[in-house]
Regions:
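Gram-negative bacterial Sec-dependent N-terminal signal peptides
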Residues: 2-32
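Acidic, low-complexity, intrinsically disordered peripheral segments
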Residues: 2-4, 10, 33, 413-467
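Small/polar, glycine/serine/threonine/aspartate-rich low-complexity segments that form flexible
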Residues: 82-114, 124, 234-244, 276, ...
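Metallo-beta-lactamase
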Residues: 212, 266, 415
Length: 467
């Protein structure tokens, strides 16, 4: 079975002669609007560029990027300066009274350079780098969810537009049928029961049309939430190309490349490095401290002094009240948790992959079945109408045949929608539902550019991407 279908949706009302003039006009306007309507790739591009959930996830990644320069800062010196000035009065009692007015002034600058921090700096840097990698995968997951929601919203609107047009057409057909039945009742060809049956079906059709209008309004609102604008009349979407050919291939790719799985892997690596970072607090710490100072004791007496020093400091932890040991144990438990979560995400990715694949296979089988059902229902309706003309069929038989055709057409539209959504679900399951793989006409967000701009930054308050 070839599942790499790229055929567009297609649904037609072959018996257009049965539609009212108003329905024909509505369908004509709908078809004309698709010439410049928003396509599915355009809608996905708009969501990629403007969706607030995705933009917030990018900002979150940029904030996590800052963990790396924060850890790298522990390789660098810290510099502090200080100054003081004041007033001091001294009185000395003796044979000769004397007083002195002193105005002390001091200034100093201190530089502290870490030499060894028990391996915490290296471990902390590696932890932060793995946290960045994990957050990038989380961003990929958010991007996939946003694009999948956008594709789903698009196809829901398309389906509901199509169903509404079918219901409008059916309402027009039943209105004509009721009018014809009343005319025949006037001349005694049919009974009052036939008229009542036609009236009942028309009332039901009106109710169905109103319900489909409500469904379309809800779908349009969901479209606006995800994509950022209300849709016009949407052209038929297509099943995405380049899908894996077999279910086993989908599962194999998903358990390796699904972003939720890869994010869990990097999170576990970060947790391992955190164990080493916390353990480093049990090791000695060595730093080099340099100091320059100037002191002026008095404005009356020349007592200026300058000093300079360079000191190596060693701090050896002996006992920290058990706090560090507890935090090491905590870090080990977190690492164990993250390792278990990798398996959890792999199982979840496999389940999602199988479900998406089965949904795709089912939708494609249903399309073939419903296409056959529509063709058969059209033939049956035409035959019932001809038989009614010679008295072999009743008005109820015609109404039933028309309803069967409508049901088949609505089911076909629903299956076509399900096929497209399932195709995008398969792409999402294998981690390929992104702007690059789907070829969206957008500037792809560069995660490396923001990271490089801050990784080795020693100072500066400007933040990339902030508004």
């Amino acid at each position: 079975m070839n599942l790499k279908s790229d055929r567009p949706f297609a649904w037609t009302l072959r018996n257009l002669g049965t539609l009212t003039a108003a329905s024909l006009i509505a369908l004509h306007v709908s078809a004309a609007a698709t010439a410049d309507a928003q396509t599915l790739p355009e809608a996905l591009s708009q969501a990629y560029e403007s969706n607030p959930t995705l933009r917030a996830a990018r900002a979150q990644l940029r904030s996590v990027n800052e963990n790396v320069p924060q850890e790298l800062s522990n390789w660098r010196p810290s510099v502090t300066a200080g100054s003081s000035i004041g007033k001091r009065r001294t009185e000395v009692d003796g044979t000769v009274d004397s007083t002195g007015n002193l105005t002390p002034f001091t200034a100093s600058i201190d530089v502290t350079q870490p030499i060894y921090r028990g391996g915490r700096t290296l471990a902390g840097t590696e932890r932060a780098e793995n946290e960045v990698r994990a957050q990038r995968e989380s961003l990929r997951s958010v991007e996939q969810n946003v694009l999948l929601n956008a594709a789903t919203s698009y196809t829901n609107v398309w389906r509901d537009q199509a169903v509404l047009q079918l219901n409008i057409g059916n309402e027009g057909v039943l209105a004509q049928q009721l009018e014809a039945t009343r005319d025949r009742f006037e001349v005694g060809e049919v009974t009052r029961t036939d008229v009542a049956q036609a009236e009942t079906r028309l009332a039901t059709a009106i109710s169905d049309r109103i319900a489909s209008e409500g469904n379309l309004a809800s779908s349009r609102a969901a479209f606006q939430e995800v994509i950022g604008s209300f849709p016009g009349t949407l052209p038929s979407p297509s099943v995405p190309g380049n899908l894996p050919a077999l279910q086993d291939e989908v599962v194999s790719i998903a358990i390796k490349d699904n972003p939720d799985v890869t994010s869990a892997v990097f999170s576990e690596l970060a947790a391992q490095k955190n164990i080493r970072q916390v353990t480093g607090e049990l090791y000695p710490e060595v730093s080099l401290v340099g100091s320059l100072s100037h002191q002026d004791e008095s404005s009356n007496v020349d007592t200026n002094s300058d000093s300079a020093s360079l000191i190596a400091q060693v701090s050896i932890p002996i006992y920290q009240q058990g706090s560090v040991s507890s935090r090491v144990r905590e870090a080990k438990q977190i690492s164990s948790q993250r390792r278990i979560q990798i398996e959890e995400q792999r199982r979840r990715a496999e389940q999602i992959a199988v479900s998406a694949w089965e949904a795709l296979v089912t939708a494609q089988a249903q399309i073939r079945s419903f296409e056959s059902a529509v063709a058969s229902a059209e033939i049956a309706l035409e035959g019932v109408r001809q038989e009614n003309e010679v008295g072999a069929r009743t008005i109820l038989d015609i109404l039933d045949a028309e309803q069967e055709l409508l049901n088949a057409q609505v089911s076909l539209v629903g299956a076509q929608r399900d096929e497209v959504v399932a195709g995008y679900q398969v792409l999402s399951a294998v981690g390929r539902l992104n702007a690059s793989f789907t070829g969206l006409p957008v500037e792809v967000y560069d995660v490396e550019a923001d990271y490089r701009s801050v990784r080795n930054k020693w100072f500066g308050l400007s933040a990339p991407g902030t508004e």
